[in-house]
Amino acid sequence: MSADQEAKEDELLALASIYDEEEFHRAESGKEGEIHLCLELPPNFKLLVKGQKSAEHNISFLPPLVLSFDLPDDYPSTSAPIFTISSKWLTRVQITALCRKLDELWEENQGNVVLFTWIQFLKEETLDFLGIQSPLEIQRSGSQPQCEPAQKHAADASGEKSKVQDLDPRAVQEVDAQTDILTQLLDFDEAQKQRVFDGKAFCCGICYSEKLGCDCLLFKECEHVYCKACIKEYFQIQIKDGKVQCLNCPEPKCASTATPTQVKLLVGEDEFARYDRLLLQSSLDLMADVVYCPRMSCCMAVMVEPDSTMGICPSCRYAFCTLCRRSYHGLSHCIATADELRSLRDEYLSSSEEGKKFLEKRFGKRVIQRAVEESFSTDWLKTNCKQCPCCGTNIQKAHGCNKMTCSSCQKYFCWICLGALSRVNPYSHFNNPDSPCYNQLFHGMEMEEDEAFGSDEDD
């Protein structure tokens, strides 16, 4: 084995021992390979979209620089490695500058292996060498993610064009026309953060067991961590109870909520479908211009025009009043049932002046007055009267025994059980031992009458 071959083999073996398989890849030919270099960004590094100074994004990782190389037979004694540098977020001008810097490093170290020197420079000094600081400005439109101001110069006064900086053919810019560059950078940053998180150990805030991040869930807003087993059970209970707005961090007084993606990863398909449906419904409930079709077989969400009380269901085409949920009645006041009148009375009496005016406008002032009067009358009748079992007339018992005579149909009935009594012998109902009202003819009579009855007997 020649000295060059031995030096190359030793260098490649050293690189394979330093970097893992995801970072360093050696081709089967033995003299080619590539290495992926993720640069270490300073804390609080930001991305800034050109023309949108308010749209800054905090990131911790950028896609790697890729150094591809081919080692000639006479490397390192005579020839330099043949290489290319590719990047998704650097411009070709910037990559060209890196290529020329690697050429300079080869000139300084000619005759010696240089790959590790190149790698160290690219990994540790690229940002400083190119003058890249936070925020890093990127350009979303066009064929390239960033503008290249150094590539072009304005024409001088004589009309002659200034020299255009030559781009190195070894400088490769990876451009995916199908995906926005900002999306690519943010997705990569998120994936790398998740990878780092998965490899760390965390103490669950619920069961206090120590588990790897791959078995845990991180609430992104507050960064509290819980194991997936605990948080899954917590989510399932909340979804079962219909509390889809309460899938927040279990930490007391913490308002951070789980994302739908996190919920979907933990619960089953049926549970997530219920969660998704209830979440949509609760969101619609908060919208003032959304009501639901009153037909029980439909219940479709309906958009209501401003200053209108008519809703038309887009599914069943039912036209209804958005106030009383009955068929649309135009300018006529809403019609209320007896139970609704009672509720209307309570709402009206407890409302402010503005609330009372709204109810009067909705139902009509006469309807409101009738609701108040009739509901009070109904309450009094329910408290003090019973209905005749034969004709339904309300009967009040002021005094006397429990054998009652209806003032309307003249039928006899029992005040206790409301059973109809015999016209021939109505008192047999109270004298029969098998009757539920046996010996109850005078049950419930007022004490004054009892005492008076007793004193008459004594006389």
UniProtKB/Swiss-Prot annotation:
Q: Where is the composition biased (Basic and acidic residues)?
A: 150-169
Record keyword Transcription present: yes
Q: What is its EC number?
A: 2.3.2.31
UniProt cross-references to InterPro entries, sorted A to Z = E3_UB_ligase_RBR (IPR031127), IBR_dom (IPR002867), Rcat_RBR_RNF14 (IPR047548), RNF14_RING-HC_Zfn (IPR031128), RWD_dom (IPR006575), TRIAD_supradom (IPR044066), UBQ-conjugating_enzyme/RWD (IPR016135), Znf_RING (IPR001841)
What does the record give as the active site?
C401
- Superkingdom assignment: Eukaryota
The signal peptide, as residue positions, is none
Q: Which residues bind Zn(2+) 3?
A: C293, C298, C313, C316
> One GO term of the cellular component aspect?
cytoplasm
Q: Which GO terms describe its molecular function?
A: ubiquitin conjugating enzyme binding; ubiquitin protein ligase activity; zinc ion binding
Name of this protein = E3 ubiquitin-protein ligase RNF14
Q: Which organism is it from?
A: Danio rerio
The function of this protein is:
E3 ubiquitin-protein ligase that plays a key role in the RNF14-RNF25 translation quality control pathway, a pathway that takes place when a ribosome has stalled during translation, and which promotes ubiquitination and degradation of translation factors on stalled ribosomes. Recruited to stalled ribosomes by the ribosome collision sensor GCN1 and mediates 'Lys-6'-linked ubiquitination of target proteins, leading to their degradation. Mediates ubiquitination of eef1a1/eEF1A and etf1/eRF1 translation factors on stalled ribosomes, leading to their degradation.
Q: Which gene carries the instructions for this protein?
A: rnf14
